[in-house]
């Protein structure tokens, strides 16, 4: 996949070991490590670091960027008895504490990754110097289930690819052109490695009750055409009152940083400068 190969040119793959298994980081921009706060990227559900494939090379111009495969996703092992964000969060905390010791990090958390960070920040607020939440769930604003399709054993390869395309368009993208053959390949690769099968927490409003425990600045970025918030996007800053800023990227779907990377970078750059 050319997009992935291009992003990996200057990356270092780091394997971090724990008693319960290994996690994998991809790290860029280590020349900035001594002079800047580490920037940690947490991907969305059924994903990997590749959710940030269109962003890492830009972000690494000024930061040391650490993109994690969350435990149970991508190349990282699944800890015991973990199936959703609530049981995952303590293990992510352990990963961050081992990687950065007592140093607080800046966080970019997309969707499920942002939810996990929000749960973690309520218990360990000093882990984060700043959190930038991107299209996060668990705000109690989902109105209905998306029209996602499942696979059957009778489907051939082209039928399976059609299901992946449909699901990407139902949840992740606003534009048909975004669901290219390369991105369908990427989706297939990521979904096949997802061992976190529950999304119960995402449909609750758990973050609303925890947000007052967050002690760092918190910012929100959403795509204007996020399928999860079609009728409720304007309510996000109303219910998530801890946000220091709320920005909407025009003409972008849920996977906003992939679909409109330039507009996304303009917003993130300003936040990271501060």
Where are the predicted features?
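Catalytic histidine-centered segment of alpha/beta-hydrolase-like enzymes
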Residues: 252-261, 265
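Flexible "cap/lid" loop of the alpha/beta hydrolase fold
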Residues: 118-122, 128-159
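Conserved alpha/beta-hydrolase catalytic His-Asp/Glu region
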Residues: 144, 158-216
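Conserved HGGG/HGGXW glycine-rich cap/lid loop of the alpha/beta-hydrolase fold
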Residues: 24-75
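Conserved loop-alpha-helix segment in the C-terminal half of the alpha/beta-hydrolase fold
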Residues: 219-252
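N-terminal cap/lid segment of alpha/beta-hydrolase-fold proteins
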Residues: 3-23
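Active-site loop/oxyanion-hole signature of alpha/beta-hydrolase fold enzymes
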Residues: 26, 53, 66-108, 266
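Gly/Ala-rich beta-loop-alpha elbow adjacent to hydrolase catalytic centers
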Residues: 109, 113, 117
């Amino acid at each position: 996949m050319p997009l992935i190969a291009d992003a990996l040119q200057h990356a270092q793959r780091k394997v971090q070991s724990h008693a319960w298994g290994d996690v994998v980081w991809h790290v860029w921009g280590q020349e900035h490590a001594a002079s800047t706060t580490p920037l940690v990227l947490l991907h969305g559900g059924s994903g990997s670091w590749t959710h940030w494939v269109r962003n890492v090379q830009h972000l690494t111009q000024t930061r040391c960027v650490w993109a994690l495969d969350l435990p149970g996703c991508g190349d990282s092992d699944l800890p015991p008895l973990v199936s959703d964000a609530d049981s995952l969060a303590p293990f992510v905390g352990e990963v961050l504490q081992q990687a950065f010791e007592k140093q607080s990090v800046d966080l970019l958390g997309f969707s499920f990754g942002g939810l996990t960070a929000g749960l973690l920040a309520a218990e360990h607020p000093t882990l984060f110097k700043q959190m930038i939440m991107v299209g996060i769930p668990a705000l109690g604003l989902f109105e209905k289930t998306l029209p996602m399709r499942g696979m059957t054993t009778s489907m051939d390869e082209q039928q399976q690819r059609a299901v992946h395309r449909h699901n990407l368009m139902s949840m992740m993208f606003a534009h048909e052109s975004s669901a290219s053959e390369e991105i369908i390949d990427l989706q297939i690769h990521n979904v096949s490695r997802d061992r976190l099968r529950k999304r119960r927490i995402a449909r609750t409003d758990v973050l609303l009750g925890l947000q007052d425990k967050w002690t760092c600045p918190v910012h929100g970025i959403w795509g204007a055409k996020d399928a999860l918030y079609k009728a409720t996007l304007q309510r996000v800053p109303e219910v998530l009152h801890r946000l220091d800023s709320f920005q909407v990227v025009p003409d972008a779907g849920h996977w906003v940083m992939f679909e409109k990377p330039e507009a996304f970078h303009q917003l993130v750059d300003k936040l990271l400068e501060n």
